[in-house]
Amino acid sequence: MRKLDFYTIDLAYVSYLKQAELAKRGFSRVPNMEYGKERKQKFLCGVVLSVNDVEYYVPVSSFKEQKPDNFLILADNGKAVSSLRFNYMFPIPKGLASVRRIADEPDLAYRRLLAQELRYCIKHQEQIQKLAERTHRRVLLGKNAGLVLNSCDFRLLEESCKSWEKNNTKETSQETSEAIESNGKPSIRAQLKKLQKQQSESAEIKVAERKSKTDQSL
């Protein structure tokens, strides 16, 4: 079990998962990343856990009530300041999450609070892991209708995650094949693009030179 850390996640991917749930359920439990067009994006921070060999992102929430499927995070003074809500966790492709560097936080007070929260999570990592696995199992079993209704559709999102990985890997592969042939040399398409760029730059230089000569003659 790797040591816990705080992570941020690609917002485009989060939006993609929300749309997948909306299409099937008519609503989504994937956390909202925006409060509205006139307001800034919501800060997203969470931990990454492996649940049934799938990486899951568990958002840190300002919600501070004890529930069966969340974990309260306490500050050094013993006060609950946030929580991990396992019914809102969602699967992510490996490598998509980025470590949230607490040292980069400009606000000193907030930086200290984040550090306290992370220390508390690390201290209780085993409990956090067990709670995540428990919630995942309970939702998949579907015996608690209220829990299922108020949780992400883990099966659906895992399939959506696989589709995201497949499509993005395919796009990367296509871009690579366009640039390089099997013998390691630049492909014809790549050479043409390079030639077009050089021709464009050369034309711009000639225009600039003509303009300079015209200005000097005036």
Specify the residue positions occupied by each region the protein language model found.
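Extended intrinsically disordered terminal tails
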Residues: 1, 170-218
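GIY-YIG nuclease catalytic motif and its immediate N-terminal context
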Residues: 1-40
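Residues at the C-termini of beta-strands that transition into short coil/loop
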Residues: 10, 61, 93
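Residue-level detector of flexible, active-site-proximal loop/helix-junction positions
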Residues: 13, 64, 96
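General N-terminal targeting signals
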Residues: 23-26, 31, 65, 72-74, ...
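Compact nucleic-acid interaction/catalytic patches
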Residues: 35, 39, 50-88
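Short beta-strand-centered aromatic/proline hotspots
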Residues: 44-48
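C-terminal terminal-subdomain/extension
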Residues: 77-180, 211
